Amino acid sequence: MQAHPNTVDPSEIAKFEAMAAEWWDPHGKFKPLHMLNPCRLDYITRQIAGEFDRDLGTERPFAGLRLLDIGCGGGLLSEPMARLGAEVVGADAAEGNLPVARIHAEQSGLEIDYRHTTAEALAEAGEQFDVVLNMEVVEHVADPLSYLRATHDLLKPGGLQICSTINRNPKSYAMAILGAEVVMRWLPRGTHDWSKFITPDELFDLLRQAGLEPVDRKGFVFNPISWQWSISDRDLSVNYVTASLRPR
């Protein structure tokens, strides 16, 4: 297994540690993620169920699957995955997020293994998972290709990675930077760096270079009239998500 340089950007970590206490406030600084979460969960659960032949109508359809949530924050994705039966490890480089995540999981009666660590450190330790959730992280790392190589090594052969990020174009600047940070003030200014955004074609190329096989991509589209998100087969102009496999 190859060595993985640390791709953590300290300035990016500091941004999220400063907001840690607000993770579970649906009207706080993580309001955009709370609004987006139903779409994220719908895509994630369907992809996992399809890949591992699980029936979402059962009580714990993901029982027996080991899942890693990279950049878990306060646990907005880790907790639903645990409720569905997965053995969940939540990893975050921002240590300040983890007390919030642990307390909320305990209050919810969920067993989640939250760790202050990075994808690279877990890969170096030889950890492997059936599923890796890599949601809204890749645009915050210093070296996306090196980071994705680590996430590849974290997957068991045949394992599934779900990776979401933000496209890089004038529309994404208008919506993710000007709209979310300046006009609506959903996020503190500087939360995102537009130059770090990645186009879908660039991400597919990076995933392939990392040894993964991209199998799907969809857009997450925000409707400003209904104030709801939906999944789109065609509109990947701002937020989008991909599914890829580690070959067996």
Swiss-Prot record:
Annotated positions binding S-adenosyl-L-methionine: 40, 71, 92, 135
One of the record's GO molecular function terms: 2-polyprenyl-6-hydroxyphenol methylase activity
Keywords: Methyltransferase, S-adenosyl-L-methionine, Transferase, Ubiquinone biosynthesis
Job description of the protein: O-methyltransferase that catalyzes the 2 O-methylation steps in the ubiquinone biosynthetic pathway.
Entry keyword Nucleotide-binding: no
Pathway: Cofactor biosynthesis; ubiquinone biosynthesis
Coiled-coil features, chain-numbered ranges: none
CDD domains per UniProt: AdoMet_MTases
Name of this protein: Ubiquinone biosynthesis O-methyltransferase
Annotated catalysed reactions: a 3-demethylubiquinol + S-adenosyl-L-methionine = a ubiquinol + S-adenosyl-L-homocysteine + H(+); a 3-(all-trans-polyprenyl)benzene-1,2-diol + S-adenosyl-L-methionine = a 2-methoxy-6-(all-trans-polyprenyl)phenol + S-adenosyl-L-homocysteine + H(+)
UniProt keyword Transferase present: yes
Family stated for the protein in its record: Belongs to the methyltransferase superfamily. UbiG/COQ3 family.
InterPro entries: SAM-dependent_MTases_sf, UbiG_MeTrfase
Naturally occurring in which organism (per UniProt): Ruegeria pomeroyi (strain ATCC 700808 / DSM 15171 / DSS-3) (Silicibacter pomeroyi)
EC assignment: 2.1.1.222, 2.1.1.64
GO biological process: methylation
